[in-house]
Amino acid sequence: GGISVDDSKSGCICHSSSPASDLMVTLSGLPATYDAGVRYNLTVALSGGPEVTSNPTNQGGFNLEASAGDLSSVDSNTQEKEDGSLTHNSEGNDQRSWKVEWVAPADDSLRVSFTLRGNAVNGDGEASEEDHWNEAEYTSKGSGYEEESPGLSTILTIALLLGIACRRRLRY
């Protein structure tokens, strides 16, 4: 079970050809600003999408990637992939909400990006256009993160160009 990262990069196309606006994929518990090395309990949730048919199994799945830090499973409903991403497993595809853990990187100067892809299915056991998927991007900045500002060389280059432009105007 589970969604591979390669499959999920273009969406969950085995379930539907394009993302569905009626399906919300959310990652809660992620701090806007993280502290280095701290463990954060996160919840992946799907809302909307197709109604589950008479069979309440096979309701959905997800794939979560982080650009830094470590994602890990906290129960038997998710699994860690070799590339460091997390996904649901066969036990975890009978639901639309999962608990996971993220350990923030030791470097608190980073801006960490998260990509969450999820699919909500109708439970009929058939991959079809009736199943929906969507994706969302999230970020968390380290407590030591600093927005990039123009460096001195950039400022000097701009000043030089302005000086040349002004000098040329004065010659005419």
Label every PLM stretch briefly:
Residues N89, R168-Y172:
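Positively charged, low-complexity intrinsically disordered regions
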Residues S153-R169:
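A cross-kingdom C-terminal cell-surface attachment/processing module
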Residues E147-P150, R171-Y172:
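Short acidic DE-rich linear segments
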Residues G1-E148:
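Sequence context surrounding c-type heme c attachment/ligation sites in exported
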